[in-house]
Each structure stands twice: as C-alpha cells, then as structure tokens.
A protein has these predicted regions:
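Homeobox/homeodomain signature
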Residues: 41, 88-89
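Short, contiguous, well-structured surface segments enriched in hydrophobic/aromatic residues
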Residues: 1-76, 99, 150-163
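Polyanionic, low-complexity intrinsically disordered segments
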Residues: 50, 60-87, 94-206
C-alpha cells in the first residue's frame, strides 16, 4: 500500500490519509463501524484493510495502479468498468433522476463499451446489433450496464447477488405496475426494456 500512496499526488495522498486519520481518531469524525480497524493499522494497512476502509473512488484508483504495475490488461479494462460504476454511484448520491438520461439526445458515454460487458451480453443472447450499440452509447445506460455487470462479476457470494436481484426485481415490478411506463413514449419504453434485459442477464430473479 505504501507504493500506491507514493504514486499518487501529494494532495491526493494528504486527502486519503487525512480522511482515514479522522475516521480512526477519537474526535467527532470517528467512524463507529471501522474506526478501530483504521486506528489499529494506521500507516501500515494490509491491502484487505485498505480496501475495507477507503472510499470507493480510491478503490477504483488503486485498481488502475495495480493494472499498470503488473501490466494486467484485464484489470485495466475492469478499471474502466469500475469508473462507470463510480460515476453512477455519484449520480445516485446526488439524487440525479437517471431516467432523464433515457433519450436519444442525452449525453453519450464517450467511450466504447467494455469488451467484458460486450462478450457477456453476447453470451446471454444480446448480440451486437444496431439497437444494442445505440442503447450502450447512452451515458446512463452504459453506467447501469457497468454496475449490473460488476455486481455479477465481483460479488461472489450467492446471498449478496440474491439480495440485489430481489431488490432490483422489486424496482422492476414497481416501474411496470405503477402505470408510468404505459404512459411513456416508445423511446423511454425501449430504454427500460433494454435495462430489463440486462437485469435478466446479470441479476435474474430466481
């Protein structure tokens, strides 16, 4: 972990260490959940502790660092996926209405879909068609795809996947049952249909 912290800018390192010091200290910013763990390993974090206590954005950046240090193309591609997850997470944290991005004129993703996501979709019957390319070109849909793929790929506990699948199933049932989609235009409906297909691919409700 010391090598990673040496690799980041002084300001970024100061922010990471300052946040951890505050959460592990005895002041008002003390973290009731992980503060004692931080205090115990302060300055000498094993990677499993570091990953447990840092912000998600730091985890994503550490993933980038490791991919470069060991020349792991797979980790590099996964880093781009996790960057999209981070962006969606930040949007949700700021109460952004994601559905507002479900239009053909909304912001583009600005990058090609990850080869991991593309391969996984194809393996589950969602082939590389003009419609798929158009949907994944949409920024919000691309971020949702990255997040659903990541839950499927990185969350290895069956109980974790089942819990998330159940929650997303409830979201789907609500969206389909409240009548909003029946009153929406065809463009909005097609975006939701594609999201449901991805949900069936990566987080199916048993």
């Amino acid at each position: 972990m010391s090598d990673y912290l040496e690799s980041v800018s002084p300001s970024q390192r100061s922010r990471i260490e300052g946040t951890l010091d505050a959460r592990g200290g005895g002041g008002r910013a003390h973290d009731e959940c992980s503060g004692d763990l931080i205090a115990h390993y302060a300055g000498q974090y094993p990677i499993w502790v570091f990953l447990e206590v840092v912000e998600f954005g730091v985890l994503v950046d550490l993933w980038r660092y490791c991919s470069g240090r060991w020349g792991e193309r797979g980790m590099r591609d996964e880093h781009y996926v996790l960057t999209s997850v981070k962006a969606l997470r930040n949007a949700c944290a700021h109460n952004s209405l994601l559905v507002n991005g479900f239009t053909s004129t909304a912001a583009n993703a600005g990058h090609q879909v990850s080869r991991f996501i593309a391969i996984s979709l194809a393996e589950h019957g969602i082939s590389k068609t003009k419609s798929r390319r158009a949907k994944l070109k949409n920024l919000r849909v691309a971020q949702i795809a990255a997040t659903l793929y990541s839950v499927n790929n990185f969350c290895e506990l069956d109980t974790t996947q089942e819990r998330h699948a159940k929650r997303m199933g409830e979201v789907r049932s609500y969206a389909e049952g409240c009548g909003v989609l029946s009153r929406a235009n065809d463009g909005i409906v097609s975006f939701f249909d594609f999201v449901w297909k991805m949900l069936d691919t990566w987080l199916p409700v048993e």
